[in-house]
Amino acid sequence: MEELILSIVKPLVDHPEDVVITPEETDTSLTYKLSVSKEDMGRVIGKQGRIAKAIRTLVYAVGSKNDKKIRLEIIE
């Protein structure tokens, strides 16, 4: 899953070396925390959050095969 997120996000940003994904797992969910540089935050979120929503939709669709709920948080 991390490879999928990286393959989507890295081409969008100017500083791909600053892209970091941190997984956090609980009994019922798996949360991926995506961190990008401040300069690239707008590119990842997009106008009215459209790009972020599209990334989340793909992650949720792929993760729906698991028993755990998958979440993606974009943090600074």
Swiss-Prot record:
PROSITE patterns: KH_TYPE_1. The keyword RNA-binding applies. One of its GO terms (molecular function) is RNA binding. It holds the Pfam family KH_KhpA-B. One of its GO terms (cellular component) is cytoplasm. The keyword DNA-binding does not apply. Residues 29-76 form the KH domain. It is found in: Cytoplasm. Keywords: Cell shape, Cell wall biogenesis/degradation, Chaperone, Cytoplasm, RNA-binding. It comes from the Bacteria. HAMAP family: KhpA. PANTHER family: RNA-BINDING PROTEIN KHPA, UPF0109 PROTEIN SCO5592. This is RNA-binding protein KhpA. The gene is khpA.
